Amino acid sequence: MSNAILHSSQYQNYRRIDLIVIHCSATRATQRYTVDDCRRDHRARGFADIGYHYYITRDGVVHAGRPLYQVGAHATGYNAHSIGICYEGGLDIRGRPCDTRTPEQKETLHKLLQRLKEDYQEARVVGYRDLPGVQKDCPCYDV
């Protein structure tokens, strides 16, 4: 795990956060998709930077994305009051939605959520698919 978790509260009071939204990268279990790949793809779509605040790779390392004081670009209509976390994966080898989180990713996500809930006690943790109006399978498991 990187230092991204240690600095999670650095700017906590700048935005009201009532949601922590879990996403997957929608990449196959056999495909490597790094935080740099995600950042590049988001910039190619016109985003200023990676849309998520945290990105967890298959090895369980959490990478800092946007600073928490910046509004993310991960859940239209919810970005202003949410934190976005994405894990690498979410599709099986055939490209179907599947919980592909590794044990390391599960452990890291659990620790990250514990840390964030210390600062944002009222925030609900939801999967992207659980938000009203979203018609996707992401994050491909029941949050």
What are the residue ranges of the model-derived segments?
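Short Gly/Pro-enriched turn/cap motifs at secondary-structure boundaries
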Residues: 44-45, 74-76
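Basic/polar, cationic surfaces and motifs that engage anionic cell-wall
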Residues: 1-21, 25, 58-62, 67, ...
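N-terminal carbohydrate-binding/catalytic regions of secreted carbohydrate-active enzymes
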Residues: 29-37, 41, 66
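Short, well-ordered coil loops that connect the C-terminus of an alpha-helix to the N-terminus
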Residues: 47-48, 122
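A short acidic/small-residue loop/turn micro-motif
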Residues: 70-71
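N-terminal cationic-hydrophobic initiation segments that often serve targeting/anchoring roles
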Residues: 39, 43-46, 117
